[in-house]
C-alpha cells in the first residue's frame, strides 16, 4: 500500500464508518476490507484530476457490485511521487459518464 503518504498525517472515511486517522490505522482498515472473504471488486471510473502543486486531487466514481460511490482522494508529492493523504467515499445516485476508464498510473 505504497500509495499512502509516509511523512504526514493521513485520514480515510469509508462509507458508513467513522473517520480513521493515522497511517497504520488507515492501512489496517484497507487490509481488513481488501482481505475479507466478501471483499468486493472496486472499479474506479471517470477520474477528474486537479493539480495545485504540491497537492493533487482526484474525484472519481467507485463502482461496487453495481452501486456507485463518489470519492475524493487527496495526494501530496513526496520524493517525486504522488502519495495519498486523504480518501473519502460516500454513496451517490449520480452515475459516471459512458466510456470512462480508470487511469493506468498516477506516477
Language model segments and positions:
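A beta-strand edge to alpha-helix "cap/lid" segment located at domain peripheries
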Residues: 2-5, 10-107
Amino acid at each position: 500500500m505504497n500509495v499512502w503518504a509516509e511523512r504526514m498525517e493521513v485520514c480515510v472515511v469509508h462509507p458508513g464508518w467513522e473517520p480513521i486517522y493515522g497511517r497504520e490505522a488507515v492501512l489496517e482498515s484497507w487490509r481488513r476490507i481488501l482481505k475479507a472473504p466478501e471483499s468486493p471488486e472496486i472499479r474506479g471510473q471517470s477520474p477528474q484530476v486537479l493539480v495545485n502543486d504540491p497537492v493533487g486531487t482526484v474525484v472519481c466514481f467507485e463502482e461496487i457490485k453495481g452501486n456507485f460511490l463518489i470519492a475524493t482522494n487527496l495526494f501530496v508529492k513526496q520524493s517525486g511521487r504522488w502519495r495519498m493523504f486523504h480518501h473519502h467515499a460516500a454513496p451517490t445516485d449520480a452515475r459516471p459518464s459512458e466510456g470512462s476508464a480508470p487511469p493506468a498510473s498516477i506516477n
